[in-house]
């Protein structure tokens, strides 16, 4: 973790964003029943810093399924290890596109 900190000693925002992309991507791949690629991250803002040692919890919620795209909202909460009180530290919407084996966008089969 010290490698994942910014000059202020807080967790680097890029690390947190990568964890969010993984959480959203897991849901998108399940919905797509296969490969899904991130095409955009929307309206992300950091509300509070995350300290080294904080317990970080991510919640991914399916927002919308289009013909080839999937929108997932991710909320991130952090809780200091010595506390029972967590707080929301960031959230964002991630948009994915379902891909076929050649890496081309494909329709999502909602019937399966």
What is each stretch, according to the model?
Residues 1-40, 97-112:
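Hot-dog-fold acyl-thioester-processing enzymes
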Residues 2-3, 41-48, 78-80:
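Short, well-ordered turn and helix-capping elements at secondary-structure junctions
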Residues 15-16, 59, 77:
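Bulky hydrophobic/aromatic packing residues
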Residues 51-52, 63-112:
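HotDog/MaoC-like acyl-thioester-processing domains
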Residues 24-59, 63-65, 69-71, 87-92:
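Hydrophobic beta-strand-centered segment that forms part of the acyl-chain substrate-binding groove
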